[in-house]
């Protein structure tokens, strides 16, 4: 089968290359992939690793075994940008017929990251919450979940002077100057949850920035530490989508063969919402 393989030493991000068909382990499902999500972290890994096969967010149909023919969505260990992929069974859930594969493929990493961030933020009823990277795959969902939790939400690309003082929670993914500004905007006893650095710029933390804002916490978040929650999180998110309370914004949908164009668009910040590869149509 033809799968996406990274080529950081070449002129483009990746190439389609013939690879062996995957063989599922006893605790895995073999899935015929219909749609696969693209995450910004995968761009970083593709620049670092030769012959890397990205793709964790997949939605499709179980291709073998007792569950053959079942529509599922899940979080793979990689190798998802391909016609077939294996996924740990404990990180997959059935996909309701009324939710399409494209929508579902936006949830296993981006959606679950947003949900985990909101849960780590504590009780948000009446609290001031700022979400950075608010037009991205994680941000679009985090903004909606924070509002569902009763927060007063400020949605921005990065924290700057336009953000009001007294933010109880800041979900920070821009890094650099944005994180510097977050230190000046957070409330007494507030929380800054750092889950990315899309600017690739260093941040300066000056103790004096905390003057008048005692007990502020700056906490890191890495999605890999929460993968065991994927199935429960996916069930929650799918329920919200089915009820119409959560809208998944697809900013780019392209065939697998055009993966380099999709990666260029995401890298150049030309995608609002989630970028999705359509595998079945390739």
Model-derived features: where do they sit?
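Glycine-rich phosphate-binding loop and adjacent beta-alpha segment
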Residues: 177-245, 279-282
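C-terminal hydrophobic helical "lid"/dimerization subdomain
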Residues: 1, 229-282
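Short glycine-centered segments of the SAM/dcSAM-binding site in methyltransferase folds
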Residues: 71, 128, 152, 190-192, ...
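Glycine-rich beta-strand-centered segment in the early N-terminal region that forms part
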Residues: 20-37, 42-79
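Mid-domain Rossmann-like dinucleotide-binding core that forms the NAD(H)/NADP(H) cofactor-binding site
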Residues: 105-164
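N-terminal Rossmann-fold cofactor-binding loop
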Residues: 155-159, 173, 196, 222
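N-terminal Rossmann-like NAD(P) cofactor-binding module of classical short-chain dehydrogenase/reductase
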Residues: 73, 170-171, 193
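A structural motif shared across PLP-dependent enzymes of the aminotransferase-like
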Residues: 76-89
């Amino acid at each position: 089968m033809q799968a996406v393989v990274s080529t950081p030493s070449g002129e483009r991000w990746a190439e389609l290359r013939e690879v062996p068909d995957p063989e599922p382990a006893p605790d895995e499902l073999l899935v015929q992939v219909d749609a696969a999500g693209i995450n910004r972290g995968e761009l970083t890994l593709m620049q670092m690793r030769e012959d890397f096969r990205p793709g964790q967010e997949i939605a499709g149909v179980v291709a073998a075994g007792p569950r053959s023919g079942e529509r599922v969505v899940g979080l793979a260990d990689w190798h998802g940008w391909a016609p077939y992929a294996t996924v740990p069974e404990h990180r997959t859930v059935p996909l309701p017929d009324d939710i399409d594969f494209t929508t579902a493929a936006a949830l296993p990493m981006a959606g679950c990251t947003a949900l985990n961030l909101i849960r780590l933020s504590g009780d948000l009823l009446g609290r001031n919450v700022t979400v950075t990277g608010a037009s991205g795959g994680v941000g679009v969902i985090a903004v909606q979940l924070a509002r569902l939790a009763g927060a007063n939400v400020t949605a921005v690309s990065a924290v700057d002077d336009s953000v009001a003082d007294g933010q109880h929670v800041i979900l920070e993914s821009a890094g650099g100057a944005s994180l510097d500004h977050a230190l000046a905007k957070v409330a007494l006893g507030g929380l800054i949850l750092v889950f990315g650095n899309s600017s690739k710029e260093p941040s300066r933390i000056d103790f004096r920035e905390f003057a008048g804002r005692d007990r502020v916490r700056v906490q890191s978040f890495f999605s890999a530490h929460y993968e065991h929650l994927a199935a429960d999180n996916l069930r929650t998110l799918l329920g919200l989508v089915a009820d119409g309370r959560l809208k998944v914004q697809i900013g780019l949908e392209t065939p697998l063969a055009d993966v380099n164009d999709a990666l260029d668009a995401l890298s150049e910040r030309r995608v609002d919402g989630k970028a999705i590869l359509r595998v079945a149509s390739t």
